[in-house]
Structure formats: structure tokens, C-alpha cells
């Protein structure tokens, strides 16, 4: 994980829980009753959607391994949004990459792919908006 990726992942985590600024403030939060992600989360990593990741991170926090839990959260965000880099074809546009990664983390691949395709179509790309970025999207 390079410095730019680390910064992007940390910003995504902060957007998920504004009280978290790093390992010392990392916490388990109760989700609202209407939330479909489960009952608990750690910076958007929910027990109902990603139980294995949530349980691993919670166990680290319970054991007092805050730094390791923070690194695990950062890596989780990067691993789960890695497709965005392949869509863009490089790391040359970190601002665009960040916005797409953050959206991907919250809305998934297909919705984020559609946003990218629609944005490119505004500039004349003529892409089919199917949410599956491929070779034409990268061009």
C-alpha cells in the first residue's frame, strides 16, 4: 500500500465514521435499526455484510491491537475497491480514483461502474451504461 492508497483508504474510513481519525479512535458502532448491514460496524465494515472481516477486526480491537485493526481496515477498503484501479488503467488520477473507490465501498461495483460510464458519456465517450467497465471505458 503506497502513501496515496493509504490516504484514500483512511479518508474513506473517516467518511464512514467521522469520529475515527486513526487507530486510537477506531471503534465498534451500533447501526440504526433500519440499516440492512447488520447490527454493528467498524467504519462501514458491517457484521451483516462482511461478517468474517468484521469479526476479525473486532477481535483485534478486543485484544487491544488497535494498530493492527487499523491496518486491517485500510487494507480491507483497498482490497474491496481494487477494481477501480483496473477500470482507470493507472494511478494517474488519484482524485477520480478516490471518489470512485469511496462510492464502490458504499454502493458496489455495478453502480459505481455506471457512474463512471455516465461521466465519460458526458464527454462524448458513447459507452453503453451497463455498470461493467471494460476496455472501451479505459480508452
Where are these regions (language model features)?
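Cell-wall polysaccharide-cleaving catalytic domain and substrate-binding groove, primarily
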Residues: 1-139
